Amino acid sequence: MKKFLSLMLCAALTLCAFAAHAENAELNIATNQYYALLERMEQFEQESGISITCEKSVDIMDTISTAYVIKNPDIDLFVFTAYDGLYTLKNMKYYTPLTDSAILQDAFQHVYPALRPVCTDDDTLMGWIIDASPMGMMVLTEYLDEWGMKSPETFDELLDECNEILAEGLLPEETGLLMQKYTQSGMMDLFMKYYIMTSLQEGRRLDFTDETFLHYVQRIKDELPAEEEPRMAFENIFMIPGASSAPSQMIQFVPRIFPEQNSAVETYVTIAVVNPYGKNQAAAIQFLEYCATHLTDGSYFIYDNLTEPIENPSMVAQLDELAEKIALLEQKADKERADEDTLRDLQEQYANMEQWRYFSSAEDIAYYQEMAKSLYVSEGSPLTYDDALQVLVQRYLNGAFDAETFAKECQNHVEMIYAEIGE
């Protein structure tokens, strides 16, 4: 942590030096993440003196491809979500290496290992993570407790519990089962997505002939309904939302598909890449160094050395106010019965509020560090749950072939992709 703080100081000194002669400095950014970047861009402008012009791009890969073809010098930095085409950009070698930035190189050592490949092309640091949002499962445990159930740890247990909840008619009004439809099609989509991500996250070659795959696709087809009754739902028992602004134990692993491996934690990453033809590359790198050293609560999703609990400022202010009132009453010489009652009430109130002092406790952060071993980021690779696989799923569910034939068809499809990308 001390080394990281020294990096922040180094970056601040660099920023001050840059600002001294940055009166006419500019930075031109093309992004499809404008509003997510807005506050950080404004802060950087104020501290650096660099003027930022931002092009809001609807189709960021079209913007990048056009800039590549014409060698556009008027865009210095591309900021976009990795799944929008980082894979393609790396194949094009369309980036400015960041290897000369000591600040970024040092900060990179603290990026969670599962996220480091996003920033690199082979061993070259070629981009910087601006934001990361992991997706996990959130479970309304109060309902499960009431029904004598526990949070499912495996995909089999998830199917078992969903089947039982429906069979027993346990769902309260205005409460759904899952965010996606609990149908053959809906659960095949969920299963296929996590089977692929978890296989790739572990570095395995996709194998749809695996017994685990055959077991689940057969079970989903045999046990789940083809359609779901319409239902007005304001909440769901099982949800897969994005994480909040800081680590929390409310976000859990999606139930395991493979017996000895946690499911992949799908993570949406905003990445920044410096245009090799940009005329303000130094300013672009300066901005990335600023992002790497000016941390937010969301930085806990990126850097593994951030372990201090994150306090809730408004709750801390209320606790401080209560502490003052308690101290005054404790110091009062001649306390009356009413004073003793008030003091006891304030102390109980303080104890209850103390459990909400932190947005993220040390336990929350430790829990996320375990989840972070399974982070998976799609970079727009062709190895995904693509249209062709979705068509095969529908054909399988419509009875075009059995589970084994379906698995072979899926395998034939991905083998063609492996051949195309030379793997």
PLM feature spans:
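Short, well-ordered beta-strand elements
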Residues: 23-34, 50-55, 77
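Short, polar/charged alpha-helical segment
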Residues: 33-51, 389
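C-terminal capping/gating helix-and-loop segments adjacent to ligand/active sites or protein-protein/ligand interfaces
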Residues: 36, 120, 326-420
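Extracytoplasmic "Venus flytrap"/periplasmic binding protein-like
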Residues: 47-111, 142-153, 231, 241-246
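Hinge/lid segment of periplasmic solute-binding proteins
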Residues: 81-136, 251-258
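Extracytoplasmic/periplasmic substrate-recognition and gating elements
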Residues: 124, 246-324, 328-331, 337
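Extracytoplasmic/periplasmic solute-binding protein
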Residues: 124-130, 135, 159-206
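Glycine-centered hinge/linker elements that transmit conformational signals in sensory
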Residues: 191-194, 199-229, 247-258
